[in-house]
Swiss-Prot record:
Residues 1-61 are annotated as: Large ribosomal subunit protein uL30. Gene3D superfamilies: Ribosomal protein L30, ferredoxin-like fold domain. Belongs to the universal ribosomal protein uL30 family. It comes from the Bacteria. It holds the Pfam family Ribosomal_L30. InterPro entries: Ribo_uL30_ferredoxin-like_sf, Ribosomal_uL30_bac-type, Ribosomal_uL30_CS, Ribosomal_uL30_ferredoxin-like. Residues 62-125 are annotated as: Unknown. Transmembrane segments: none annotated. It comes from Aquifex aeolicus (strain VF5). GO terms for cellular component: cytosolic large ribosomal subunit. One of its GO terms (molecular function) is structural constituent of ribosome. This is Large ribosomal subunit protein uL30. Keywords: Ribonucleoprotein, Ribosomal protein. Part of the 50S ribosomal subunit.
Length: 125
């Protein structure tokens, strides 16, 4: 089964107990902490519950005609996360989105009509 890297992008202070439990079930406790987890419905359900707090790491290569989106599974911890125009990034090509629709909206705003996803399929926007 494939894997995905999940990062806690915002702190838990002031959040409802439901959101805190969803984040803790992902194994995240502190802001900036990352975990590599199995890609399964249980994990995605918890990501959806706390979508405003966590993000899945994607590496986007804009060098070709259409951007190539890969899931970033690097083991090296990345402590630098900045919020550029509402999008969380490390400034080195890794972007954090909690929903695929957010990723597609980001690419659409950059002027792209399609992209190649991590499965090698071309996806129309």
């Amino acid at each position: 089964m494939s894997k995905l890297k999940v990062k806690l992008l915002r702190g838990l202070a002031g959040e409802s107990e439901r959101h805190i439990q969803a984040v803790k079930s992902l194994g995240l406790k502190k802001r900036g902490q990352e975990r590599i987890l199995e890609d399964n419905p249980l994990v995605w359900g918890n990501i959806r519950k706390a979508f405003h707090l966590v993000g899945v790491a994607y590496r986007i290569d804009f060098s070709g005609d259409i951007p190539t989106v890969e899931r970033d599974l690097s083991e090296k911890p990345d402590y630098t996360v900045i919020n550029k125009n509402g999008v969380y990034t490390n400034g080195k090509g890794v972007y954090y989105f909690s929903r695929i629709t957010d990723l597609e909206d980001f690419l659409r705003k950059k002027g792209y009509k399609k992209y190649k996803n991590w499965k090698g399929e071309e996806v129309e926007l």
